[in-house]
Amino acid sequence: MDSESDDNPNDPEDRKKWGHKDVEHWRAVSNVHYYAREGYFGTAILVCDGRLATIKDPALAILKGVCLTLLGKIPDAIRHLETFVTDNDVALGALHALKWAHASAFNPDNKSIVEIETEISTRARNEKTPYTSYATASEVLYFAGEYQKSKQMLDIARKRATEKHAKHYCLLGWIELALGKKQKSTQELFEKAGGQEYPDGNIGRCKILEGHHSAPEMKVAANELAISTIHFLPGHIEKAKASIMMKDWRGVMDCIMNADQPEGSNPYIEVLRTVHGICYAGEVSMLKRTLQLLLKSLDENEATNHVLYARITKLLVSISGRDEKILRHARDFLTRALKISRKPDYVALSMRIAFGLGGAKEVSTLSQELVALDCEDSYAVLSSVVSMLMISRVSDARAQFDILPSAHPKLLESPLYYLIASVLAKQSKDKSFENFRQHIENLVEMLRNQLQSFPFGLDYLSLFSSDLLYSAVEQCFDFYPLVPIKAPDDCMKLTAKTLQMIYDVAPGLAHCTLQLARNSYLCSNTNAAEKWIEKVLDKDDSLADAHILRAELILDRGGKITDADDALVTGLNFNFKLRETSLYHLIKSKTFKKRNENDEAIKTLKMALQIPRKEPSKNLFQPKESADTHKISVQLELIDTLQHMKRIQEAETTMTDALAEWAGQPEQDQLVIAQAQLYLTKGHVERALGILKKIQPGQSNFHLSRIKMAEIYLEEKKDKRMFAACYRELLKVEATPGSYSLLGDAFMKVQEPEDAINFYEQALKMQSKDVQLAEKIGEAYVMAHLYSKAVNFYESSMNIYKDKNMRLKLANLLLKLRNFEKCEKVLRAPFERDPEPVGTETIQTYIQFLLLLAECHEMMDNVPEAMNDFEKAKSLHSRIQDKTLTAALKKEGARICNLQAELLYRRREFSQAVDICKQALAYHETDLKANLLLSKIFKEENKWTLVLQPCQTVIQVDPHNDEANSILADFYYIRSEAAHASTSYTTLLNTNPQHWHALSRVVELFCRNGEQNAAEKHLDRAKEVNPRCVTESGYNVCRGRFEWYTGDQNEALRYYSRTKDSAAGWREKALYYMIDICLNPDNEIIIDENSVENPETTIVEEASEQQKLAKYYLDLLGKLPTTDRFLLAQNFIRMHTTDKSAIQAALDEFNRMAFNADRSQVTNVGAVFGVARGHVLLKQVQKAKTVLKMVNGRVWNFDDSDYLEKCWLMLADIYINQNKNDQAVTFLDLVFKYNCNCLKAFELYGYMREKEQKYVEAYKMYEKAFMATKERNPGFGYKLAFTYLKAKRLFACIETCQKVLDLNPQYPKIKKEIMDKAKALIRT
């Protein structure tokens, strides 16, 4: 019965009831099935023995026989199975298993096989044969690999059974999976089995999800299994595998711990522990024990399972990164396999290990054995070539290498083939780096393609071949610069890409990470190098070379010499042989040089030159790096130190000796270029040019010297003419397409595209099929603003080269030119020709067409069509991800979703945008754009509780992300967490001093905290970075706010007024602040209850002027949407008068805004202050007090802070006038709690103590106020001097008076009333 019939509602199978659940049997069978499928046959037998020792279970006993057969224990299997051939319930299964065992014997007993086949036929035709017998036979045939026969047997079993059995559904699922049937129907079979709590059904679900690369769903399914089925180890193993797929290495270790197995008891668990240890933990001290535990576990559980030993060996070698210790341990595993069976594949694997360890003799021996064996493994086929290259027999190796692909075409798909090709390219006559680079690129690309279809897991890691990748990296060492260069060249980029590939898979391989640090250091990216070194030491702090590189970095970055010394000593402690290397002495000399101990530096360098040169290895796979080429760097450093000490003659002699020593060797060319680079780093530009000019045509480094000279002329001397002349000289000597192209690149670099076009066209004539050259011509036309020519060129090139990238470039250009119709036509054309693209690369290109089409449709205001384009792009992307979901594909899926979400965000369709962002995060959980967009949306929707999580995710990935840090700081600000907010805003300003939003918040927070100097430093720093920032509205609002806090209202008004004509935002803030100052100049209330009752002409006129000016500013705001803040300002202006009717009208409006319908709750603190102010002006003080008390207990926040402060100050003022000073102090202290710099609070406090004649306490308050205003406010100066006088602090009084008069000569009142009296008192 096919699985398709399970979907049929009329299927008789569906009308049957489910059979009995035998939980213990199910668990045992599921365990055995799992281990047998995974190749752990010995472990499966132990599970069988454990159950069979306590209970009779014929079906399980048959499975034991199957496992014995799979393990190659044929006699044991036959003896065991013969006892069950008469058991009617399992006879068919026993007979099939017995037939398989006999057929697997070294000398099969054909007579016995015929007899068994006869018995099978008889029983199969017998109607009385029970369904269990057929079901058991189906199991046996499944494990024998006869899936079609297995299915036939299972169909009969299901028909004969009177009940439905979960075991049957599950087995059918595994058979269909093996036959490659539709996975949807197969998944339904597993789900039906799993629904009946049959463990292997859930394992099947995990297998399908693994094939779909659906790690999160697989982890959920495995987790359900681990929880629901107690002590079912495969559930924990599958969960660990899902964690590996997600690269959640900590989760892997959690699964191992939760499995709760004694160390070394289960080989599968130990494999996972070992993979975690090598790929992630990287703890060298623990790794030896971990590998020993794995070997012990295999010896105890799988002693005769040579296939498993070999499989684990291959896994270890593949993830070793060619680490010597791991390879030696791997050899121990392979030795077990080879003792049992000397299969050709095992010998080839042995060859791979020997090659990795650099054992030329062993490789030679194994090569001779492999030649005699029939083995298609690339290590076997290429073994003799490898052997020859390891002893420098280049010509013999090349001759054999050239003919091998014709006999073995599959070699061209082998990464090892391209590694050998790269070595031979280095040994060719022209020593072309381009050829070498191409072979390494092919190696990386070939490996990447082979891995693409595999989910990230144990099979992926077995194929990964980090040992080969690291060998490829080592080959690049010979092209490394001797001293750091300004920007990475092709070699450094290639190496970094390869190393990054290793790091992405196995960050625990510290020696590979160290090479990333070294790469960054040589590319002058010291920040990245430092971070990589930290990661290296985090994994393996015993790596001496990491400490040495750290010392070098510290010195180059101008760090503490003691730190560099410490790093050197630490490195030396871990590897004392470092004293015998030139590098150690080179770095040691630099520490002496930093201390100006130049004689010691020279002595150390000379000592390094006396170290005997190591004999270069004949092994061409070993880089010359290991032969200590740092000697050249030592010679260059010695020359530089001697020159620094004016010992010119000695320096020249050293240079001559160095050139003579390396004469005729490739190092000689490197020496000259490195010397020029060294001069350049010291700022000696002319010396560098002088050395490079000496290199003449015909010398191997002529090409490189002229490119270096061009770089110096452009970047150091800003001489475009000489920059071009260097390339012209190159062209004169080498008139190749490459030289013409280089000259074109040079003119593009100096913004002269017309000249570039001429040279590019010349190169294209010589190399007409070069698509990259054609692209460069198109780019040059665009740079030259020759758009119609660019369009025509792209159109013709698109038709000539049939290149999809040309179509993209044409469409992009048409989009920029706003030629939407033609752009749409160009992008739609491929879909009209081929609506259903096939192949990963083609589909990816079509996705780019759709994304560009979406942009085009959005610009045409055809948003529905743009959304349709995005959906098509996602649909195409899902077709690729069904096959494989690599990290790059995940990021691409997230990018598509992000572009769609950004479109929705721009249209303020937030709900849909959030949904699409979540789709992006399903692809890539830590995607920066998606998380950042979610944060922005939640911020705009005022959903602050949702802002934090996506924002923190961004910061974890990118700690210096400006936008995320700004949103996070705002989150803390809104939550009134001042300390957190200050720290976050300060971090932003350290990165960008002109981050006006952060600066405005910092001014607010610091001034409230009494740290005006700190606030002013940030303002001054912004001005230092960009003196023109004084014209920017953001700066002026921040400065105005600072001046307001420090009591200079006129200065504040001056800064605010500069923003009146700027764009909304800062302008709006400034206008509100200006209105506030107009109504409350110098922090003094002009209109009070007395002026309303008895209006004086001067007060009425002054109030009228202020009101008019405030109205003017309000009118400027009138075009903005009416908000609560606008209404507050409007009514405060209306109240700023002596007209009682106007005051009452404003009061009524404030009453409407301040409370809810039943007046039980405050809805607007600003309006409450307005109500209270109105009551005070109308001499209804008690009513004012009652209203103000309603804000008591309100949680303080920055939004309400100004008006809460005003309410508390008004209450304090009322209590002071009523002589209730204790109550007044309560509210003044409340003000100081949130604004320890409040001038009005200082004033009221001082006034209150004056009334009590406590002049010492009064002057302390006035002192704080006067200091807060930078001693510029004459009012506070007067009050301070007066209280000094009353407290008999006469000299302080006179000094204060003098300060006031120095700044305000027009303030004679202080001299007459206070200063003169103080002087008179001193005289008496």
From Swiss-Prot:
Keywords: Cell projection, Cilium biogenesis/degradation, Cytoplasm, Cytoskeleton, Repeat, TPR repeat
TPR repeat ranges per the UniProt record: 58-91, 414-446, 582-615, 669-702, 737-770, 772-804, 806-837, 847-880, 894-927, 929-961, 963-995, 997-1029, 1033-1066, 1205-1238, 1240-1272, 1274-1307
Keyword Repeat: yes
Position of the signal peptide: none
PROSITE patterns assigned to the protein according to its UniProt record, in alphabetical order: TPR (PS50005), TPR_REGION (PS50293)
Subcellular location: Cell projection, Cilium; Cytoplasm, Cytoskeleton, Cilium basal body; Cell projection, Dendrite
Gene knockout outcome: Shorter cilia with an irregular morphology resulting in functional defects characterized by defective movement, dauer formation, and mating behavior. Double knockout with intraflagellar transport protein ift-43 results in defective cilium morphology and function.
GO process annotations (BP): cilium assembly; intraciliary retrograde transport; protein localization to cilium
Distribution of this protein across tissues and organs: Expressed in ciliated sensory neurons in the head and tail.
InterPro entries named in the record: ARM_TT21_2nd, ARM_TT21_4th, ARM_TT21_5th, ARM_TT21_C, ARM_TT21_N, TPR-like_helical_dom_sf, TPR_rpt, TTC21A/TTC21B
A GO CC term assigned to this protein in UniProt: intraciliary transport particle A
Subunit structure: Component of the IFT complex A (IFT-A) composed of at least che-11, daf-10, dyf-2, ift-139, ift-43 and ifta-1.
Family: Belongs to the TTC21 family.
Protein task: Component of the IFT complex A (IFT-A), a complex required for retrograde ciliary transport. In particular, may act redundantly with the intraflagellar transport protein ift-43 to regulate the transport of specific ciliary cargo proteins such as che-3 which are related to motility. Functions in cilia biogenesis.
Protein name: Tetratricopeptide repeat protein 21 homolog
